[in-house]
Amino acid sequence: MIFQELNKFNNVVFTEEGHTYTLNGEPLTSVTTFIGKFKKPFMRDFWADKTAQKENTTREEILNKWDSITVRACNKGSKLHAYAENYINNKILPNTIYDFNIDNEAYTKIESHFLEFYEESKKNLIPISSELCVGSSALGLCGMVDQLYYSDTLGGLVIFDWKTNKKMNYKSKFQNKMLEPVSHLDECEFT
């Protein structure tokens, strides 16, 4: 029954280059892009100038530093996603098939947390699908489910989204809110 329902998503295609989704050949908006429409744009140059002044350096150095942090964070996330998908699906060499420029000590902690979760979750979560592309032509949205499980405890499906953020803030530390019509929500990692 579950797998028959998941067949609805067989025509959702994710293209890594350009990070785009299509459903039956029609381009759709990613959920991440959609959510981004309700966030205030980050004033990169303004804040780079402020930070450069505070740290007694140049805007270019700050921008390069931020870009480097972003690349490493994305690589760390990609590595965990690949590791989790391979591990859950019993693929043998999840750590050696990708070359990532990341802080290995920090990543090792993340991997360790995943393995703890995996061992604990085997008691009541049954893996259904990893990196599952989903979408709705009615909503015009597509996205990727990192891991779909069936929960014995809940008697239904549970969606997991692997996170490697340094912090997971549930509130905005600057009291920033999302834009209308979701302005009641804090702008933070949790939203």
Feature roles, as predicted:
Residues 1-79:
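Charged, glycine-rich intrinsically disordered N-terminal tails and low-complexity linkers that flank
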Residues 3-6, 68-188:
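Catalytic cores of nuclease domains that cleave nucleic-acid phosphodiester backbones
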Residues 191:
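Pseudouridine synthase
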